[in-house]
């Protein structure tokens, strides 16, 4: 079976999990990475003989507002699919239900869904996850889901009404250490970084991709307000949550 991994993954958590699943089913799987702005309007049709794994991060209980439209050009023809929502140890709320609604409207048949824990964008929460134990569980789940003709489990949550919030409160700063290499501008999912390499707060979705990818750590959130919040949030979400799999 030909497998395609589709994901929006600014900091790499979703990519790791989805590619682990895809690799367990097809060592030659195809990738459609809709994180990149140039993939925002990608179009592709899939047959009933293929399988697609969709992966999305959870922002405030939903999939990112910038990501949802990037799935609209991907159409199935009774195509089996697996859904994976990755979240930072708080909760995934309605994200899986939102993904399910989009997938079904676009012609996909859901054979499994997963709520997966990864490092949170903010603070130092679940650093190192997904770990190898997580990824091995993901692979085992994918093998079962691929053989699943009809889901027996109900996907938690409800399809949300209205548009998702555009992004979080905290917008990355740029220090004088910036060497203007252009990595942040090139890889920003929403082109929120200008010619001066500063982050435009009106477009930024607070994914922190630029912070994680900056080779000289010039992109940062080094403010008293953020440090205080991150310390509180890290403590609040310190208890490990386990992944949830639905078949």
Language model features with spans:
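Short, charged low-complexity linear segments at domain edges
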Residues: 151-170, 179-195
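FMN-binding flavodoxin-like domain, especially the glycine-rich phosphate-binding loop
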Residues: 2-5, 11-17, 21-36, 42-168, ...
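A generic structured-segment signal
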Residues: 6-7, 188
């Amino acid at each position: 079976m030909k497998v395609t991994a589709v994901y929006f993954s600014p900091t790499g958590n979703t990519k790791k999990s989805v590619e682990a699943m895809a690799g367990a089913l097809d060592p030659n799987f195809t990738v459609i990475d809709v994180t990149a702005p140039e993939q925002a309007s990608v179009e592709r049709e899939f047959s009933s003989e293929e399988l697609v794994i969709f992966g999305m991060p959870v922002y405030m209980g939903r999939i990112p507002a910038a990501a949802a439209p990037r799935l609209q050009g991907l159409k199935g023809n009774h195509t089996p699919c697996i859904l994976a929502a990755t979240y930072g140890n708080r909760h995934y709320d309605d994200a899986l239900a939102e993904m399910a609604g989009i997938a079904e409207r676009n012609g996909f048949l859901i054979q499994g869904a997963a709520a997966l824990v990864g490092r949170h964008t903010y603070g130092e929460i679940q650093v190192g996850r997904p770990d190898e134990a997580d990824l091995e569980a993901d692979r085992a789940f994918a093998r079962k889901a691929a053989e699943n003709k009809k889901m027996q489990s109900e996907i938690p949550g409800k399809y949300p009404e209205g548009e998702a919030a555009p992004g979080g409160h905290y917008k990355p700063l740029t220090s004088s250490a910036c060497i203007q290499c252009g990595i942040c501008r090139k890889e920003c999912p929403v082109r929120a970084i200008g010619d001066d390499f500063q982050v435009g707060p009106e477009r930024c979705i607070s994914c922190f991709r630029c912070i994680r990818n900056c080779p000289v750590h010039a992109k940062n959130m080094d403010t008293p307000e953020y440090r205080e919040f991150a310390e509180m949030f890290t403590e609040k979400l310190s208890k490990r949550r386990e992944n949830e799999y639905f078949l």
